[in-house]
Design a protein with these regions (language model features):
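Short, Lys/Arg-enriched, disordered terminal segments
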Residues: 1-2
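Aromatic- and Gly/Pro-rich donor/ligand-binding loops
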Residues: 5-14, 18-137
Length: 137
């Protein structure tokens, strides 16, 4: 069985990472024979906004040493984030269907935030109607 998780895996946020890791590990425990991966779908606008928010230099708050520390933390965070297997990069529902997943897990709740920069109908399952999907929050 092949299971894919569609989430905000690219957001540099501890909560986003921990919910992704928690879902990944839970699915591995529930389906030990399954191949569990994160669907490597990235909303570029959302990613840019997130990374620029992290990397911007705040005059009066950041110093050169605190900024260097911020970059070091980002690298460490990215290393742990990438320890969870991902599919090849995909941009459309058709490309997700072409992954031939037996189950697609949509979640957690933040992917359905209509007001956030990460909104995309694909995260609601648009285009995946004929696929076996479940959602969690």
């Amino acid at each position: 069985m092949k299971i894919g998780i569609l989430t905000h895996h690219y957001v540099k946020n501890y909560g986003a990472f921990l919910q992704m890791k928690g879902m990944y590990e839970t699915l591995q425990r529930l389906y030990p024979e399954a191949e569990v991966t994160v669907i490597n779908y990235v909303n570029q606008k959302h990613w840019r906004r997130n990374i620029l928010h992290i990397l911007h230099f705040r005059p009066g708050i950041d110093t050169l040493s605190t900024y260097v520390e911020k970059i070091r933390q980002l690298r460490t965070f990215t290393k742990y984030e990438r320890s969870i297997p991902r599919t090849r990069p995909v941009k459309t529902a058709k490309e997700i269907i072409d992954l031939k997943l037996d189950l697609i897990v949509l979640g957690s709740d933040e992917i359905w935030n209509l007001c956030g920069s990460g909104y995309h109908p694909l995260k609601f399952g648009t285009g995946l109607e004929n696929q076996r999907t479940i959602a969690y929050a």
